[in-house]
Design a protein with these regions (language model features):
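N-terminal "assembly arms/tails" that initiate or stabilize quaternary assembly
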Residues: 1-81
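Protruding loop/beta-arch "assembly-hinge" segments enriched in small, turn-prone residues
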Residues: 1-34, 38, 204-207, 220, ...
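Broad gene-expression machinery/nucleic-acid interaction feature
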Residues: 46-48, 87, 165, 169, ...
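Extended oligomerization regions of viral-like shell subunits
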Residues: 53, 155-247
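Residue-level signal for secondary-structure boundary sites
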Residues: 59-60, 98, 180, 221
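Short acidic, glycine/tyrosine-flanked loop/strand segments centered on an H-E-D-like triad
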Residues: 76-99
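Alpha-helical scaffold segments that mediate packing/assembly in large oligomeric complexes
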Residues: 93-164
Length: 260
């Protein structure tokens, strides 16, 4: 008969491995869908959302002697947006569902929703990447003047001005450049309470020329260590919701002993 002290190493076969906790990998919140106009495509109204935009009319000066015979034509243009469908599929065998930790199963349940929200944000960023005007240069840190310039290009645009609110969406690394610009004097001269002190203590969350700044880590950093940022009026972009989010379960008894 063996003798000695009983330790966990001696009784390793009797120890169970228990999942104490589980968590999903953290993701960035969907930023862009929250900052644009959102409309719903009504049921039984076709595949596309359609809006009619009318061009400006011209008025003219007259006198008391004027016999006005210059009718203006209305010029209409159709803006058509067709929503794209997004879907995700998972399959869990009955054996997996029976034997997996309930803590793990609870986390797995929300991953599909996270993926859908991330896809919406990435699609929004792709659309914004088609913006017509580019400010700044490759390899050069952004300055707050670029954001102010973009803001006034929007609100004073000669073709059609954009109205407030105006948002700026940037990668956090780019927002750090804004922080550096505003906090550059710290250590060189006294910093009284104000914008600089506020940013130094709480991070860069100030508006710039009425542009609200938002961090979105889903923005891609390219091979030059650059990340694009976007400044836009809310009404410039329309997110059309077609089918509402839904979940469905289909039994597959012939796969792996059954699953869904």
């Amino acid at each position: 008969m063996a003798t000695g002290r009983n330790t966990t190493g001696v009784l390793a076969d009797s120890l169970d491995t228990i999942v104490a906790s589980a968590r999903a990998r953290r993701e960035y919140e969907a930023v862009v869908p929250q900052l644009v106009d959102r409309v719903d495509l009504s049921p039984h109204s076709g595949l596309s959302w359609k809006e009619i935009m009318f061009a400006k009319l011209s008025a003219q000066a007259i006198t008391e002697q004027t016999v006005l015979d210059n009718p203006q034509l209305f010029d209409d243009t159709a803006i058509t947006i067709t929503p794209q469908m997004v879907q995700i599929q998972t399959f869990i065998t009955d054996k997996t569902g029976r034997n997996l930790s309930t803590k793990s199963l609870a986390q797995m349940g929300k991953l599909a929703g996270n993926a859908m929200m991330r896809k919406r944000d990435e699609d929004g960023l792709t659309a914004l990447d088609g913006s017509t005007t580019q400010l700044g240069t490759i390899g050069t840190p952004i300055v707050t003047g670029d954001i102010a310039a973009a803001r006034y290009r929007i609100t004073s645009n000669a073709t059609e001005p954009g109205n407030l609110p105006i948002s700026g969406v940037f990668h956090g690394y780019v927002i750090k450049d804004m922080y550096d610009e505003l906090a550059a004097g710290i250590g060189s001269y006294p910093v009284p309470e104000g914008a600089t002190a506020q940013v130094f203590k709480g991070g860069f969350n100030l508006p710039i020329a009425q542009v609200s700044i938002h961090e979105d880590g889903n923005i891609t950093i390219d091979s030059n260590a650059d990340a694009k940022g976007f400044v836009f009026a809310k009404e410039a972009w329309v997110l059309v919701n077609g089918m509402t989010l839904k979940t469905e379960t289909r039994r597959e008894p012939h796969i792996g002993g059954g699953g869904e």
